[in-house]
Amino acid sequence: MNQVDYLRISLVDRCNFRCQYCMPEQAKLEFLAQSEVLTGDEILTLVRDVFLPLGFTRFRLTGGEPLVRPDVVEIVGKIAALPQVQDLSMTTNAYLLTELAEDLYAAGLRRINISLDSLIPAVFDQIVGTQGRTRWQQVWEGIQAAYRVGFDPLKLNVVVIPGVNDQEVPDLAALSLDRHWHIRFIEFMPIGNAHLFHHKGWIPSEELRQRIRDRWGLTEGYVRGNGPADVFQIPGAKGTLGFISQMSECFCDRCNRVRLSADGWLRPCLLNETGQIDLKTGLRDNVPIEELRERVRQLLLLKPEINYKGRDSGTAGAEYHRTMSQIGG
């Protein structure tokens, strides 16, 4: 088991998209009231006084969509200023990134992952939900803005949905040819989208690699980061390709992260709804910080047993009742 030193912090459960795999339009969601969401100061307290003393050095801000939170730049600046923080990154849909990229970079953010599930605007809108207007062009402009500002590495996340965008995999891989972009293909997961998952299933990463291999060739590669991706490269390309195979190639033994939801629940495993602890209530009830730190330490000791290992079938096993946006992907 790897040392657990990586915390993913969900800043908000809301999003300006309704992606099929994260916040399906069919899902009847009850969003958190503002009073239920961790404040910026509470997040800073947990990072500084609970997680850093336990050996956490790497942090990623997620959602929902983190950029819809008004104080996102301030939160980035406060965490980035902590001397023990070795790496601070963010996952975003980039819809608001054009106007925020420079401020985020100036605040100390250096790495960013952007969701880009299709190069075809109509398919992209089918996946993310239009809410009355197309979204692709503004996302593409946000990606370009992040590239100009200097985020490095700049990673593009592609959730591969059979029959929807899987035919685009070679074209998406080609984005790595002429730019230092890192394209990551993620197997479709059964998180709050059972109606889609049972119908469509998932495509193993090895099959995706073979499609790229047939068109471009493929060699092993490397890119800086904290994730479980297996990294490859098209020969001669400036960027790389990553494959996150949580369904077909279990990587529980390599897991180095825990997740903090927007309402303060610490979750040791994305695919297991047991073993969570409520840190927000402890903070607001003035539980001594040493006690909160000990609760987290004890949870980390249990993490190897909590990690979900039943990925033999996409339709077998537990039902996942919370959406990815509620968990904090």
Curated annotation (Swiss-Prot):
<dbReference type="GO" id="GO:0051539">
    <property type="term" value="F:4 iron, 4 sulfur cluster binding"/>
</dbReference>
<keyword id="KW-0342">GTP-binding</keyword>
<dbReference type="InterPro" id="IPR000385">
    <property type="entry name" value="MoaA_NifB_PqqE_Fe-S-bd_CS"/>
</dbReference>
<feature type="binding site">
    <location>
        <position position="252"/>
    </location>
    <ligand>
        <name>[4Fe-4S] cluster 2</name>
    </ligand>
</feature>
<feature type="binding site">
    <location>
        <position position="8"/>
    </location>
    <ligand>
        <name>GTP</name>
    </ligand>
</feature>
<dbReference type="GO" id="GO:0005525">
    <property type="term" value="F:GTP binding"/>
</dbReference>
<keyword id="KW-0547">Nucleotide-binding</keyword>
<dbReference type="Pfam" id="PF06463">
    <property type="entry name" value="Mob_synth_C"/>
</dbReference>
<keyword id="KW-0456">Lyase</keyword>
<feature type="binding site">
    <location>
        <position position="189"/>
    </location>
    <ligand>
        <name>S-adenosyl-L-methionine</name>
    </ligand>
</feature>
<dbReference type="InterPro" id="IPR007197">
    <property type="entry name" value="rSAM"/>
</dbReference>
<feature type="binding site">
    <location>
        <position position="155"/>
    </location>
    <ligand>
        <name>GTP</name>
    </ligand>
</feature>
<dbReference type="GO" id="GO:0006777">
    <property type="term" value="P:Mo-molybdopterin cofactor biosynthetic process"/>
</dbReference>
<feature type="binding site">
    <location>
        <position position="22"/>
    </location>
    <ligand>
        <name>[4Fe-4S] cluster 1</name>
    </ligand>
</feature>
<dbReference type="InterPro" id="IPR013483">
    <property type="entry name" value="MoaA"/>
</dbReference>
<keyword id="KW-0408">Iron</keyword>
<dbReference type="InterPro" id="IPR006638">
    <property type="entry name" value="Elp3/MiaA/NifB-like_rSAM"/>
</dbReference>
<comment type="function">
    <text>Catalyzes the cyclization of GTP to (8S)-3',8-cyclo-7,8-dihydroguanosine 5'-triphosphate.</text>
</comment>
<keyword id="KW-0004">4Fe-4S</keyword>
<dbReference type="InterPro" id="IPR050105">
    <property type="entry name" value="MoCo_biosynth_MoaA/MoaC"/>
</dbReference>
<dbReference type="GO" id="GO:0061798">
    <property type="term" value="F:GTP 3',8'-cyclase activity"/>
</dbReference>
<keyword id="KW-0479">Metal-binding</keyword>
<keyword id="KW-0501">Molybdenum cofactor biosynthesis</keyword>
<feature type="binding site">
    <location>
        <position position="269"/>
    </location>
    <ligand>
        <name>[4Fe-4S] cluster 2</name>
    </ligand>
</feature>
<protein>
    <recommendedName>
        <fullName>GTP 3',8-cyclase</fullName>
        <ecNumber>4.1.99.22</ecNumber>
    </recommendedName>
</protein>
<feature type="binding site">
    <location>
        <position position="21"/>
    </location>
    <ligand>
        <name>S-adenosyl-L-methionine</name>
    </ligand>
</feature>
<dbReference type="GO" id="GO:0061799">
    <property type="term" value="F:cyclic pyranopterin monophosphate synthase activity"/>
</dbReference>
<dbReference type="Pfam" id="PF04055">
    <property type="entry name" value="Radical_SAM"/>
</dbReference>
<feature type="binding site">
    <location>
        <position position="255"/>
    </location>
    <ligand>
        <name>[4Fe-4S] cluster 2</name>
    </ligand>
</feature>
<comment type="pathway">
    <text>Cofactor biosynthesis; molybdopterin biosynthesis.</text>
</comment>
<feature type="binding site">
    <location>
        <position position="19"/>
    </location>
    <ligand>
        <name>[4Fe-4S] cluster 1</name>
    </ligand>
</feature>
<dbReference type="InterPro" id="IPR010505">
    <property type="entry name" value="MoaA_twitch"/>
</dbReference>
<feature type="domain" description="Radical SAM core">
    <location>
        <begin position="1"/>
        <end position="229"/>
    </location>
</feature>
<comment type="subunit">
    <text>Monomer and homodimer.</text>
</comment>
<keyword id="KW-0411">Iron-sulfur</keyword>
<keyword id="KW-0949">S-adenosyl-L-methionine</keyword>
<feature type="binding site">
    <location>
        <position position="91"/>
    </location>
    <ligand>
        <name>GTP</name>
    </ligand>
</feature>
<feature type="binding site">
    <location>
        <begin position="257"/>
        <end position="259"/>
    </location>
    <ligand>
        <name>GTP</name>
    </ligand>
</feature>
<dbReference type="GO" id="GO:1904047">
    <property type="term" value="F:S-adenosyl-L-methionine binding"/>
</dbReference>
<feature type="binding site">
    <location>
        <position position="15"/>
    </location>
    <ligand>
        <name>[4Fe-4S] cluster 1</name>
    </ligand>
</feature>
<feature type="binding site">
    <location>
        <position position="64"/>
    </location>
    <ligand>
        <name>S-adenosyl-L-methionine</name>
    </ligand>
</feature>
<feature type="binding site">
    <location>
        <position position="60"/>
    </location>
    <ligand>
        <name>GTP</name>
    </ligand>
</feature>
